[in-house]
């Protein structure tokens, strides 16, 4: 591998943009890379380079999660531009599960919209610990009082979903006007343009408000596979974020879930096209697997230290069923209901076998808004463990969120 080495000098943070469709998430991502490219080691990325999938071009809506890297004075960031459209919440669930914090982008002309709320709820469910808000399109509002009202509404919405709405930083600005200024003069520095300053101010707030996470480097290694590539002459590469532990080139690992357990050796590690000898929890990496064909491994499997996690199909869980207002079902459901269960990077159909209320009494039907214990049997075995969170989806919408209480089989 003649690639350049990845230098681990600054703390590494995984971050992303979330929010309603067309509120300016991808534009903001581009503005951040352009503004930071002036100050140091960041490569400027244009909107078109981030907004990369062909289906998306047709609709102007971000689908696949795009990974971008940038640096501030204090940190190295990997940024996921998260899909905004309801059909692609699936990617948000798998992309967001990788975030140490997120920038919630809200258009000042609309305020919080239904998808904004769905994304805040999902951020809570998949465990995004910290949010910072960018109130975009500020230039289109000429009334300061209106901006203040929108800010109040945002804080109230965040509080409703158990985020600290009163202390979360809200930065107003215009990502588009910042990009226009940077296109005219790519060398703009702080103090020369108010719109660019607002982007730099946002990054200062992210640096200070989103804490550097303590990585689980001393636990047993586990990576949930997001994607699989075949590289001619080199073999099969699985990509994903290391959830816990660390891994070195040459170590033996197991591939678990969806198919029979397979053992393999790691022959290479890469991050942002640079090679690594060792990768640690929090890193988004490509892992080269010895002797594994592309058809033997797929998204949703995990790569783990041998003997540390098993595939299972049946578990008991505590679940919250979303109300109609939260974007959930309008009607109750019964035993035998078969929705999709989203766990880590995988979605598997599961059959709900039985329900119990919190006091242990058996329940015949479940209403939107109920908190319930339920036993689930999946159609395929996946690597799961006690304490793991999951989302329940059906027909393009999130209908519930849960946590595994114990494994049955």
Swiss-Prot record:
Enzyme kind, highest EC tier: hydrolase
Location of the region described as G5 in the Swiss-Prot/TrEMBL record: 174-176
Binding site for Mg(2+): 26
Region: G3, residue numbers: 81-84
Major site of localization recorded for this protein: plastid
Keywords in alphabetical order: Elongation factor, GTP-binding, Hydrolase, Magnesium, Metal-binding, Nucleotide-binding, Plastid, Protein biosynthesis
Homology family: Belongs to the TRAFAC class translation factor GTPase superfamily. Classic translation factor GTPase family. EF-Tu/EF-1A subfamily.
Name of this chain's protein: Elongation factor Tu, plastid
Species of the source: Euglena longa
């Amino acid at each position: 591998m003649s690639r350049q080495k990845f230098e681990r000098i600054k703390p590494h943070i995984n971050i992303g943009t979330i929010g309603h469709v067309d509120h300016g998430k991808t534009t903001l991502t581009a503005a951040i890379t352009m503004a930071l490219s002036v100050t140091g080691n960041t490569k400027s990325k244009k909107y078109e380079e981030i907004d990369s999938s062909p289906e998306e071009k047709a609709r102007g809506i971000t689908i696949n999660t795009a990974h971008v890297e940038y640096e501030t004075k204090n940190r190295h960031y990997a940024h996921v531009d998260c899909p905004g459209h309801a059909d692609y919440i699936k990617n948000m669930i798998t992309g967001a599960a990788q975030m140490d914090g997120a920038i919630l982008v809200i258009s000042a002309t609309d305020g919080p919209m239904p998808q904004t709320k769905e994304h805040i709820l999902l951020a809570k469910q998949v465990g995004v610990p910290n949010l910072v808000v960018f109130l975009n399109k500020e230039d289109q509002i000429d009334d300061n009082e209106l901006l203040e009202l929108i800010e109040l509404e945002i804080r109230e919405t965040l509080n409703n979903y158990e985020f600290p709405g009163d202390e979360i930083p809200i930065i107003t600005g215009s990502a588009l006007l910042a990009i226009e200024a940077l296109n005219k003069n790519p060398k703009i520095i702080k103090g020369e343009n108010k719109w660019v300053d607002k982007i730099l101010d946002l990054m200062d707030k992210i640096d200070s408000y989103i804490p550097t996470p303590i990585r689980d480097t001393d636990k047993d290694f586990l990576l949930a596979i997001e994607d699989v590539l075949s590289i001619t002459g080199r073999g099969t590469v699985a990509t994903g974020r290391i959830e816990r532990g660390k891994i070195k080139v040459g170590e033996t690992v197991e591939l678990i879930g969806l198919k029979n357990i397979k053992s393999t050796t790691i022959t290479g590690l890469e991050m942002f096209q640079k090679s690594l000898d060792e990768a640690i929890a929090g890193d988004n990496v490509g892992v080269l697997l010895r002797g594994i064909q592309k058809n033997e491994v797929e998204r949703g499997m995990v790569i783990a230290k041998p003997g540390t996690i098993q595939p299972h199909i049946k578990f008991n869980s505590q679940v919250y069923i979303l109300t109609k207002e939260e974007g959930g079902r309008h009607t109750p459901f019964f035993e035998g209901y078969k929705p999709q269960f989203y766990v880590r990077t995988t979605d598997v159909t599961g059959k709900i076998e039985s329900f119990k209320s919190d006091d242990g009494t058996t329940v015949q039907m479940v209403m939107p808004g109920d908190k319930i214990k339920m036993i689930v049997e999946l159609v395929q075995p996946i690597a799961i463990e006690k304490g793991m969170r999951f989302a329940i989806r059906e027909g393009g919408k999130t209908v519930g969120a849960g946590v595994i209480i114990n494994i049955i089989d």
